Protein backbone atom coordinates (compact mmCIF):
# COMPACT_ATOMS: atom_id res chain seq x y z
CA UNK A 1 0.00 0.00 0.00
CA UNK A 2 1.21 3.49 -0.82
CA UNK A 3 2.01 6.03 1.88
CA UNK A 4 -0.76 8.60 2.30
CA UNK A 5 1.21 11.52 0.81
CA UNK A 6 2.11 9.50 -2.29
CA UNK A 7 -1.47 8.32 -2.72
CA UNK A 8 -2.69 11.93 -2.39
CA UNK A 9 -0.22 13.03 -5.07
CA UNK A 10 -1.37 10.23 -7.38
CA UNK A 11 -5.00 11.27 -6.94
CA UNK A 12 -4.10 14.90 -7.62
CA UNK A 13 -2.32 13.84 -10.83
CA UNK A 14 -5.31 11.66 -11.75
CA UNK A 15 -7.58 14.72 -11.50
CA UNK A 16 -5.22 16.71 -13.72
CA UNK A 17 -5.05 13.82 -16.21
CA UNK A 18 -8.84 13.52 -16.16
CA UNK A 19 -9.29 17.21 -16.99
CA UNK A 20 -6.76 16.97 -19.83
CA UNK A 21 -8.41 13.79 -21.13
CA UNK A 22 -11.83 15.44 -21.22
CA UNK A 23 -10.33 18.41 -23.07
CA UNK A 24 -8.63 16.09 -25.57
CA UNK A 25 -12.11 14.74 -26.32
CA UNK A 26 -13.06 18.21 -27.56
CA UNK A 27 -14.24 19.99 -24.44
CA UNK A 28 -13.09 23.39 -23.25
CA UNK A 29 -11.88 23.72 -19.68
CA UNK A 30 -14.67 26.15 -18.85
CA UNK A 31 -17.29 23.56 -19.80
CA UNK A 32 -15.92 20.86 -17.51
CA UNK A 33 -17.74 20.19 -14.28
CA UNK A 34 -16.08 19.22 -11.05
CA UNK A 35 -18.27 16.11 -10.92
CA UNK A 36 -17.22 14.79 -14.33
CA UNK A 37 -13.53 15.47 -13.67
CA UNK A 38 -13.79 13.59 -10.36
CA UNK A 39 -15.73 10.73 -11.99
CA UNK A 40 -13.18 10.43 -14.81
CA UNK A 41 -10.40 10.36 -12.20
CA UNK A 42 -12.23 7.60 -10.33
CA UNK A 43 -13.00 9.50 -7.14
CA UNK A 44 -16.14 10.90 -5.56
CA UNK A 45 -16.82 14.61 -6.19
CA UNK A 46 -16.19 15.58 -2.56
CA UNK A 47 -12.72 14.03 -2.88
CA UNK A 48 -11.87 16.74 -5.42
CA UNK A 49 -11.79 19.33 -2.61
CA UNK A 50 -8.95 17.50 -0.86
CA UNK A 51 -6.77 18.51 -3.81
CA UNK A 52 -8.20 21.73 -5.27
CA UNK A 53 -10.40 24.47 -3.85
CA UNK A 54 -12.36 24.72 -7.10
CA UNK A 55 -12.06 24.23 -10.85
CA UNK A 56 -10.23 27.55 -11.22
CA UNK A 57 -7.45 26.29 -8.98
CA UNK A 58 -7.21 23.10 -11.04
CA UNK A 59 -6.93 25.29 -14.15
CA UNK A 60 -4.16 27.34 -12.57
CA UNK A 61 -2.23 24.18 -11.71
CA UNK A 62 -2.61 23.03 -15.32
CA UNK A 63 -1.25 26.40 -16.52
CA UNK A 64 1.69 26.03 -14.14
CA UNK A 65 2.36 22.53 -15.45
CA UNK A 66 2.36 23.53 -19.13
CA UNK A 67 4.42 26.59 -18.19
CA UNK A 68 7.11 24.35 -16.74
CA UNK A 69 7.07 22.19 -19.86
CA UNK A 70 7.14 25.23 -22.16
CA UNK A 71 10.03 26.87 -20.31
CA UNK A 72 11.99 23.60 -20.21
CA UNK A 73 11.51 23.41 -23.97
CA UNK A 74 12.81 26.93 -24.37
CA UNK A 75 15.87 25.96 -22.31
CA UNK A 76 16.48 23.04 -24.71
CA UNK A 77 16.15 25.35 -27.70
CA UNK A 78 18.41 27.93 -26.03
CA UNK A 79 21.01 25.23 -25.36
CA UNK A 80 20.81 24.13 -29.00
CA UNK A 81 21.11 27.68 -30.32
CA UNK A 82 23.73 29.17 -28.00
CA UNK A 83 25.75 26.30 -26.59
CA UNK A 84 25.78 24.01 -29.59
CA UNK A 85 25.64 26.60 -32.36
CA UNK A 86 22.40 25.05 -33.54
CA UNK A 87 20.39 26.12 -36.51
CA UNK A 88 16.82 27.32 -36.47
CA UNK A 89 15.50 24.13 -38.11
CA UNK A 90 16.83 22.04 -35.23
CA UNK A 91 15.30 24.40 -32.67
CA UNK A 92 11.92 24.21 -34.41
CA UNK A 93 12.16 20.40 -34.44
CA UNK A 94 12.90 20.39 -30.68
CA UNK A 95 9.81 22.52 -30.06
CA UNK A 96 7.54 20.43 -32.31
CA UNK A 97 8.74 17.19 -30.70
CA UNK A 98 8.01 18.49 -27.19
CA UNK A 99 4.55 19.70 -28.22
CA UNK A 100 3.81 16.28 -29.74
CA UNK A 101 5.07 14.49 -26.61
CA UNK A 102 2.96 16.74 -24.34
CA UNK A 103 -0.04 17.20 -26.62
CA UNK A 104 -2.69 17.43 -23.89
CA UNK A 105 -0.80 20.17 -22.04
CA UNK A 106 -0.34 22.28 -25.15
CA UNK A 107 -3.92 21.63 -26.27
CA UNK A 108 -5.03 23.08 -22.94
CA UNK A 109 -2.77 26.10 -23.48
CA UNK A 110 -3.93 26.66 -27.06
CA UNK A 111 -7.62 26.50 -26.20
CA UNK A 112 -7.68 28.25 -22.88
CA UNK A 113 -5.63 31.32 -23.76
CA UNK A 114 -8.95 32.65 -25.09
CA UNK A 115 -11.23 30.40 -23.00
CA UNK A 116 -13.97 31.16 -20.54
CA UNK A 117 -12.12 31.05 -17.21
CA UNK A 118 -10.71 34.48 -16.36
CA UNK A 119 -8.18 33.21 -13.80
CA UNK A 120 -6.78 30.71 -16.31
CA UNK A 121 -6.62 33.33 -19.11
CA UNK A 122 -4.77 35.72 -16.79
CA UNK A 123 -2.31 33.01 -15.74
CA UNK A 124 -1.65 32.13 -19.39
CA UNK A 125 -1.13 35.84 -20.14
CA UNK A 126 1.41 36.05 -17.31
CA UNK A 127 3.15 32.92 -18.64
CA UNK A 128 3.30 34.47 -22.11
CA UNK A 129 4.85 37.64 -20.63
CA UNK A 130 7.45 35.61 -18.70
CA UNK A 131 8.39 33.68 -21.84
CA UNK A 132 8.61 36.96 -23.77
CA UNK A 133 10.98 38.43 -21.17
CA UNK A 134 13.14 35.29 -21.25
CA UNK A 135 13.31 35.42 -25.05
CA UNK A 136 14.13 39.13 -25.06
CA UNK A 137 17.05 38.40 -22.73
CA UNK A 138 18.21 35.62 -25.07
CA UNK A 139 17.98 37.89 -28.10
CA UNK A 140 20.44 40.32 -26.50
CA UNK A 141 23.07 37.58 -26.86
CA UNK A 142 22.64 37.30 -30.63
CA UNK A 143 25.32 39.25 -32.50
CA UNK A 144 23.00 39.96 -35.43
CA UNK A 145 20.62 41.84 -33.13
CA UNK A 146 23.14 44.00 -31.28
CA UNK A 147 21.88 47.09 -33.12
CA UNK A 148 18.47 46.87 -31.38
CA UNK A 149 17.78 48.47 -28.01
CA UNK A 150 15.99 46.69 -25.15
CA UNK A 151 12.55 47.94 -26.26
CA UNK A 152 13.14 46.74 -29.82
CA UNK A 153 14.23 43.32 -28.59
CA UNK A 154 11.18 43.10 -26.35
CA UNK A 155 8.87 43.93 -29.27
CA UNK A 156 10.59 41.27 -31.39
CA UNK A 157 10.33 38.70 -28.59
CA UNK A 158 6.67 39.59 -28.05
CA UNK A 159 5.90 39.07 -31.75
CA UNK A 160 7.66 35.70 -31.78
CA UNK A 161 5.96 34.43 -28.62
CA UNK A 162 2.51 35.62 -29.71
CA UNK A 163 3.06 33.94 -33.09
CA UNK A 164 3.98 30.66 -31.40
CA UNK A 165 0.94 30.83 -29.10
CA UNK A 166 -1.32 31.68 -32.06
CA UNK A 167 -0.05 28.77 -34.14
CA UNK A 168 -0.32 26.16 -31.35
CA UNK A 169 -3.70 24.87 -32.65
CA UNK A 170 -2.15 24.17 -36.08
CA UNK A 171 0.89 22.55 -34.47
CA UNK A 172 -1.29 20.31 -32.29
CA UNK A 173 -3.76 19.39 -35.03
CA UNK A 174 -1.92 20.13 -38.28
CA UNK A 175 -3.82 20.89 -41.44
CA UNK A 176 -3.66 18.40 -44.30
CA UNK A 177 -0.09 19.34 -45.25
CA UNK A 178 2.65 17.96 -43.03
CA UNK A 179 4.74 19.96 -40.60
CA UNK A 180 8.52 20.09 -41.05
Identify the role of each PLM range.
Residues 7-19, 37, 62-70:
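Generic hydrophobic, amphipathic alpha-helix propensity
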Residues 14, 25-57, 61:
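Helix-turn-helix
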Residues 59-66, 109, 131:
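Alpha-helical DNA-contacting segments of helix-turn-helix folds
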Residues 75-101, 157-160:
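Hydrophobic alpha-helical connector segments
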Residues 98-101, 137, 157-179:
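Amphipathic C-terminal alpha-helical segment
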Residues 118-144, 154-161, 165-166:
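Amphipathic alpha-helical packing segments from all-alpha helical-bundle domains
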Amino acid sequence: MLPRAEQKQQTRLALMDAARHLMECGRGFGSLSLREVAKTAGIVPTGFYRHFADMDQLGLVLVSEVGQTFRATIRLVRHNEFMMGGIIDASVRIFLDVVAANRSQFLFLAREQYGGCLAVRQAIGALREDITSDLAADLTLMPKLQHLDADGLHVMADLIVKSVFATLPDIIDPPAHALP
